[in-house]
C-alpha cells in the first residue's frame, strides 16, 4: 500500500490499526472513511513478501480469510457457495457432463480463463495458466474452510508466532 506520510498521520498512524489482524484492510477502511480511494495494479511496484512454498500461501490465506468474512458462518456459507458455483462446477460440468451441461461448463470455463489473461499478462505469466483458475479457486476455498475451522478451535490468525484472531462464535 502506497500512501503519503501526512495522510497516514491524519488517520491516526500505525497505532490506529495496531491490533488489526488484516492491517492493510484496516488501513484501507480508515482512508475509505475519508473519501474515495484508488485500487490498482502497476508494473512499478514489487512485493517484498516472499511465498516460495505452497504452504506459505496456504498459511497466508488461512491466517485471515475467516476474519475477512467477519467470523460469520452465514458469510462463510455464501462464500463457499459462490466459489463452487463460479469456479468449481463449470470445469466439473465441462469434464464430466454431457450435452448442454458440458457446453455450459466449457463456455463458463473459457470465459473465466479469458477474463484472467490480462492479469496474467501484467505479471508476465503464460496465458495458459488461466486454465488453472478453477484449481486455484478450489485451493482458496480449502484455505478459507481451514481458516474457519482453526478460528472455531480458537487457533485462528496464527501470525508472528501467536494466535491473533478472536475465537469464532
Task: Give the label of every model feature segment.
Residues 25, 36-41, 46, 129-169:
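Membrane-proximal soluble regions of multi-pass membrane proteins
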Amino acid at each position: 500500500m502506497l500512501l503519503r506520510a501526512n495522510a497516514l498521520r491524519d488517520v491516526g498512524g500505525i497505532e490506529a490499526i495496531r491490533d488489526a489482524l488484516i492491517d492493510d484492510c484496516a488501513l484501507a477502511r480508515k482512508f475509505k472513511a475519508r473519501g474515495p480511494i484508488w485500487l490498482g495494479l502497476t508494473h512499478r511496484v514489487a512485493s517484498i513478501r516472499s511465498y516460495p512454498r505452497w504452504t506459505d500461501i496456504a498459511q497466508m490465506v488461512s491466517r485471515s480469510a475467516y476474519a475477512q468474512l467477519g467470523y460469520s458462518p452465514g458469510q462463510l456459507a455464501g462464500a463457499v457457495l459462490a466459489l463452487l458455483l463460479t469456479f468449481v462446477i463449470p470445469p466439473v460440468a465441462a469434464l464430466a457432463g454431457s450435452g448442454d451441461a458440458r457446453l455450459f461448463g466449457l463456455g463458463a470455463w473459457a470465459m473465466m480463463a479469458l477474463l484472467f489473461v490480462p492479469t496474467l499478462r501484467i505479471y508476465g505469466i503464460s496465458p495458459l495458466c488461466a486454465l488453472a483458475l478453477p484449481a486455484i479457486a478450489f485451493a482458496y476455498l480449502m484455505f478459507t474452510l481451514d481458516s474457519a475451522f482453526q478460528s472455531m478451535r480458537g487457533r485462528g490468525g496464527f501470525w508472528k508466532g501467536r494466535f491473533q484472531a478472536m475465537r469464532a462464535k
